[in-house]
Amino acid sequence: MDAAFKKSFAPEPLAVTDPVPKYTGLAPETTAFDIDGVIADTMRLFVDIARESFRIDHLRYEDITSYNLEECLDIAPAVIDAIIQQIIAGTHAPQLHAIAGCCQTMARFGRNGHPVRFVTARPEADVIRTWLENTLPLGAGQIEVVATGSFDAKATVLRSEGIHIFVEDRLETCFLLSQAGITPILFAQPWNRSPHPFREVSSWEEIASLLAE
């Protein structure tokens, strides 16, 4: 989930015509991560806010089958917008949690003190950077966050940073990254279950098994 995650601005997935770049393992020098839906359990926070602030008790995590929330949820668009604004601004009462296993794997990933890079389509980085600093077991100054404000801008940022591998939960973004020569790893979620040609992980334990030694 990212800045405008209730709408999907990317084009329909295109067939990948070029071979996927060779996968060589995850290392801080060449690997970066999306935040919402990969590090942060943001869609579960969406469900919690809907229940606690708007008394929407029927919504389940598994009901979120599209990044365009208006397509898959029987909730008024104004309520969806209000929940999203709470998430982006960090004004929500329920707590935003890390996805299970993330913290342990991040401790290993950043153990040598290298910067760990995160790229999000949120419109600004301050709120989520503070959350990352308070949540992840990384050293002071290791966390680097770029907020692009759009899904389409991720590839440009990643290429400029020398990133070759990106862990992402939005399938449309994976297609865009692949077309730009970046190897996406799809973090499996209910909203990305369409067919795709990419490497996929369903847990942080799987990501841990892919780390470069």
Where are these regions (language model features)?
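Asp-based, Mg2+/Mn2+-dependent phosphohydrolase catalytic module
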Residues: 3, 8-11, 16-20, 155, ...
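Short catalytic/ligand-binding loop motif for oxyanion handling, primarily in non-cytosolic enzymes
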Residues: 40-42, 47-48, 125-128, 155, ...
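Active-site neighborhood of HAD-like aspartate-dependent phosphohydrolases
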Residues: 6-84
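Short phosphate-binding/catalytic loops that engage adenosine nucleotides
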Residues: 113-114, 163, 182
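Substrate-recognition element of Asp-dependent hydrolases with the DxDx(T/V) motif
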Residues: 91-98, 102-132, 147-148
